[in-house]
Curated annotation (Swiss-Prot):
Organism: Xenopus laevis (African clawed frog)
Post-translational modification note: Oxidation of Met-45 and Met-48 by MICALs (mical1, mical2 or mical3) to form methionine sulfoxide promotes actin filament depolymerization. Mical1 and mical2 produce the (R)-S-oxide form. The (R)-S-oxide form is reverted by msrb1 and msrb2, which promote actin repolymerization.
Example of a GO biological process term: axonogenesis
Its biological purpose: Actins are highly conserved proteins that are involved in various types of cell motility and are ubiquitously expressed in all eukaryotic cells.
Gene Ontology molecular function, alphabetical: ATP binding; hydrolase activity; protein kinase binding; structural constituent of postsynaptic actin cytoskeleton
The protein's name: Actin, cytoplasmic type 8
Length: 376
């Protein structure tokens, strides 16, 4: 236990899930939904110990009586009071540590507004009294986790998708592209197409059921048109799914129509490019000399890249866009759901990284803006 006393804490705050644990571990100890729930009704049972807010799994399990809010939208914190509740819950209930005893590594979305990283820094030092902290860019950590320092990361989570070209460990900000299309949009889309089939999902609680459907039977078709034809002519692609109340629903072409929206955002009424084209555009914004390295090191990361078939489809689509002689390699590590966290765990335990931490003393001398000088 002795060495854990000083272990750094690594917290990857995603729009959908918060991943937290100790640097040096190979997986996060705690993974829970980034949600804060407040009761919809007045409590009637006296002495029940009802709280005015619930966080994470507890909010999830009581979702029927709560209104659920996500403090992180599109990868960026929009509600700081709720965010503080999530961090408090992470330290005291999930990891059971005293934050004033451990350095904390937090993650941020690429192109996160400057004011946001300052606010994170301020809360860590002033509310939680951490001895040291650091803010790292999510996609860069995913690349470290795959054992590379150069490549392009297509990171797609619950709230946002980014394509981030990285050369020798540095993200190239001019070529980072953001796509506001991710897991949550796919959940909403699946709700819509299931409603068209006559199943009704409307409340925030029912949306969580649809999220589960999205994660279990869905996959990415290699050839969408052909798959649609197969689904129309036979029932070979149908799968049944049991709802919490025992009702069984059958889903057919929804299985691949849902994630297809990643490649064809027009399905959601969006005019943006699909993930394959966004990745290609990101590469094209980079210096011509490094493109070859990016094509050969295209790393997928985040929960929304967990669909079976997604790597083959990316390979096919990017091959069609790139010069014909180009070697294209899509890397889809099996643990990519947590690769941001794993990269953070690796980074925070490197001996060379120890001088990179922002200390409480530096913060007291310079204020929150220190984060821009020390974390890049």
């Amino acid at each position: 236990m002795a060495e854990e006393e000083i272990a750094a804490l690594v917290i990857d705050n995603g729009s959908g899930m918060c991943k937290a644990g100790f640097a040096g571990d190979d997986a996060p100890r705690a993974v829970f939904p980034s949600i804060v729930g407040r009761p919809r009704h007045q409590g009637v049972m006296v002495g029940m110990g009802q709280k005015d807010s619930y966080v994470g799994d507890e909010a999830q399990s009581k979702r029927g009586i709560l209104t659920l809010k996500y403090p992180i939208e599109h990868g960026i914190v929009t509600n700081w009071d709720d965010m503080e509740k999530i961090w408090h819950h992470t330290f005291y209930n999930e990891l059971r540590v005293a934050p004033e005893e451990h350095p904390v590594l937090l993650t941020e979305a690429p192109l996160n507004p400057k004011a946001n990283r300052e606010k994170m820094t301020q809360i860590m030092f002033e509310t939680f009294n951490t001895p040291a902290m650091y803010v790292a860019i999510q996609a860069v950590l995913s690349l470290y986790a795959s054992g590379r320092t150069t490549g392009i990361v297509m990171d797609s989570g619950d709230g946002v998708t980014h394509t981030v070209p990285i050369y020798e460990g540095y993200a190239l900000p001019h070529a980072i592209l953001r796509l506001d299309l991710a897991g949550r949009d796919l959940t909403d889309y699946l709700m819509k197409i299931l409603t068209e089939r006559g199943y009704s999902f409307t409340t925030t609680a029912e949306r969580e059921i649809v999220r589960d459907i999205k994660e279990k039977p869905c996959y990415v078709a290699l050839d969408f048109e052909q798959e649609m034809a197969t689904a129309a002519s036979s029932s070979s692609l149908e799968k049944s799914y049991e709802l919490p109340d025992g009702q069984v629903i059958t889903i057919g072409n929804e299985r691949f129509r849902c994630p297809e929206a990643l490649f064809q955002p027009s399905f959601l009424g969006m005019e943006s490019c699909g993930i394959h084209e966004t990745t290609f555009n990101s590469i094209m914004k980079c210096d011509v000399d490094i493109r070859k390295d990016l094509y050969a090191n295209t790393v997928l990361s985040g929960g929304t890249t967990m669909y079976p078939g997604i790597a083959d489809r990316m390979q096919k689509e990017i091959t069609a866009l790139a010069p014909s002689t180009m070697k294209i390699k899509i890397i889809a590590p099996p643990e990519r759901k947590y690769s941001v966290w794993i990269g953070g765990s690796i980074l925070a335990s490197l001996s060379t990284f120890q001088q990179m931490w922002i200390s409480k003393q530096e913060y007291d001398e310079s204020g929150p803006s220190i984060v821009h000088r020390k974390c890049f």
